[in-house]
Regions:
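N-terminal leader/linker segments that initiate helical-solenoid repeat arrays
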Residues: 2-110
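Short coil turns that delineate tetratricopeptide repeat
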Residues: 90, 123-124, 168, 203, ...
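TPR alpha-solenoid repeat register
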Residues: 95, 128-129, 173, 208, ...
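Canonical tetratricopeptide repeat
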Residues: 98, 131, 135, 176-177, ...
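Residue-level recognition of tetratricopeptide repeat
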Residues: 101, 121, 134, 179, ...
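Structural motif corresponding to the intra-repeat A-B loop/turn of tetratricopeptide repeats
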Residues: 106, 139, 184-185, 219, ...
Length: 289
């Protein structure tokens, strides 16, 4: 029971973190003030093509993360890391799994993903590559550092590519790969086509539908976004789905519908940061009615 409650709390906190990060890094009407808008964001919201990203150093990432936690937890991590370094090669995967879980429990997705990648390289199963790809995507979504984001996205892309090699029909692998392509690892429409194919075969696939919905918002296709998020809410209501629905309505000047969607997001999220944002947003929209 306690584990279920904790998992739900972590999911909600993570969802809000991703949502807030999305809101404040996209040039979408109503979400940023004119003076805060940037002019160098590529069309569609994807990352601009660049040179090969700098590799991620696991030791540096670990040290940075440990500096943010209490001494006892840091010591526990260090002890596991020392065990991993001293393990025989055939024992390293088991310790890497423990470290990946420990880092995930502490909400540090980057070192967790790096250890999962080690496991996947040693035990190349479909599930291992899917978990690795998902963790790198989580790290990508939660990270605002433009220097490390490309490397995280590339690693996610590589993990899902490896998963596709093992099972090219797997919807989770195809969805993950499509998301990385849409976000900058290729031509966005190629990624959209992959996600559309997933939804065609599995209309209730939340991950693929959410990705298509957010891309519709990023690219200014608000009518399509409304339909997509209405479908998502019919499958499984969530704070972020309602918020994105409100965003789409607002951008089309449908303020009454936007307010209703925003308030539904606030009710489901029960998050102070998002509640304050929504309260301010609702006040602003009521003045426009």
């Amino acid at each position: 029971m306690l584990n279920n409650i904790r998992s739900k709390q972590i999911f909600i906190v993570s969802a809000i973190a991703v949502l807030v990060a999305f809101l404040f890094t996209r040039d979408i009407k109503g979400l940023v003030k004119p003076k805060e808008e940037t002019s160098n964001m590529p069309a569609g919201g994807q990352m601009a093509p660049s040179a090969a990203p700098e590799p991620i150093n696991l030791e540096e990432v670990s040290t940075t993360a440990k500096n943010l936690m209490n001494t006892n937890l840091a010591a526990e991590i260090t002890s596991l890391e020392n065990k991993y370094k001293g393990d025989a090669e055939d024992k390293k995967a088991a310790t890497a799994k423990i470290l990946a879980q420990k880092w995930d429990d502490l909400e540090h997705a980057i070192p967790s993903a790096l250890y999962l990648e080690i496991v996947a390289n040693k035990e190349q199963t479909l599930n291992n590559w899917l978990i690795t790809g998902d963790r790198f995507l989580k790290a990508f979504d939660n990270n605002r550092d433009s220097l490390i984001q490309p490397a995280l996205l590339q690693k996610a892309n590589s993990a899902f590519t490896n998963a596709m090699k093992l099972d090219s029909t797997n919807n989770d692998a195809k969805t993950g790969l499509g998301i990385t392509i849409v976000n900058g690892m290729g031509m966005p429409m190629q990624g959209i086509a992959m996600l559309m194919d997933v939804v065609k075969k599995d209309p209730k696939n939340l991950k693929a539908n959410m990705s298509l919905g957010t891309f519709a918002i990023k690219s200014g296709q608000f009518d399509k976004a409304i339909i997509r998020f209405q479908d998502i809410i019919a499958i499984k209501p969530s704070p972020d789905a309602y918020f994105y629905l409100g965003t789409a309505y607002e951008n089309l000047g449908k303020n009454t519908e936007a307010i209703e969607a925003y308030l539904s997001s606030k009710k489901l999220a029960a998050n102070a940061t998002l509640s304050k944002f929504i309260d301010d947003k609702v006040t602003e929209l009521k003045l426009k009615k």
